[in-house]
Amino acid sequence: MPRYHLFTFTLAFGLLTVTALSQTASVALEQRIAHYDPAKMRASTAVHSGAGGMQFGNLVDVKYVTGNLIFFQRGVLNPHSSIGEHYHNRCEEMFIILDGEAEFTIDSRTALIKGPAAVPDRMGHAHAIYNPTDKPVQWMNVNVGMGPNYDAFNLGDSRVGVSLDAIPQFPSMRFDRALLRPMEAMDGGKGTAQYRRGLEPTIFSTPWAYVDHLVLPPGASTGSRALPTISEVYYVMAGAGTVKTGSDTSPIQAGDGIPVDINQPRSFAQSGSEPLEFLIVGVAKDMDAKVALMNAKPPARGGRALAPAGR
């Protein structure tokens, strides 16, 4: 699919329209959960006038959440390949790498960041990503808009071989377990969860509310909780467990994406020997809900915080 950008790809998959209300209620939980399958990803070259190629596709079906989540994608950025620099003027996008390292660009300033990490591109700014290594990088992409439609303006710059800043001159988030904060009985659950809000609502200009990092150690769980104005998508970075929404329960594992709609009770439990690790994206149903979240007093999550584990 040479020289197609992410909008064209998303439109081809028929997932660009975001309805005012989701279709969650009529679909069983196990059907709403998305499972990453590399064999189903579509090859693309020169993405946003970038170098080389990649394989990617839509993971979570956005019709299962309320709000302007335009897409939630998963894929692989090939060695020595890039997504060229491009602007978003009515939406915001966040590139994520789950391993390796990549050169992230915001407004033509570039820095090398080791994964797992995420870099948001705020509305009205330009971004790009380049994999300078000899190994493929596991990649994700999330987009939230002011409305239901995606926009992009390509600059024709692959960002290959550019000079690097020693310190990134833009917001970023590392998914580093050493930075997590212990939360006892989170949302009324069992054991001690490890949690951090890595990107606050003030980072974003759209109804995008936050990006969180959550780890449930062996034997831990969260209690049931529903948010009246915020939808969430949970991506399982590692481990296995179960999710319960309402009366439905389903197993989950690494690579799964779980949409949780507004007013939908949800709880998670870890299983097996490996901690259950999540990347969480929160999207407000509208800007009024986003402003209310920003004006609310912390903490944003239930549970009792223990001694800080770092910033």
Regions found by a protein language model. Name each.
Residues 67, 123-149, 242, 254, ...:
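Ligand-binding loop in jelly-roll beta-barrel domains
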Residues 8-20:
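Bacterial N-terminal signal peptides
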Residues 73-88, 212-227:
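Conserved short histidine dyad/triad with adjacent acidic residue
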Residues 23-69, 84, 149-208, 223, ...:
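A short, N-terminal "cap"/entry segment at the start of jelly-roll beta-barrel domains
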Residues 90-102, 229-242, 246:
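Glycine- and acidic-residue-biased ligand/ion/polar-headgroup-sensing regions
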Residues 109-124, 247-263:
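Short acidic-glycine-tyrosine-enriched beta hairpin
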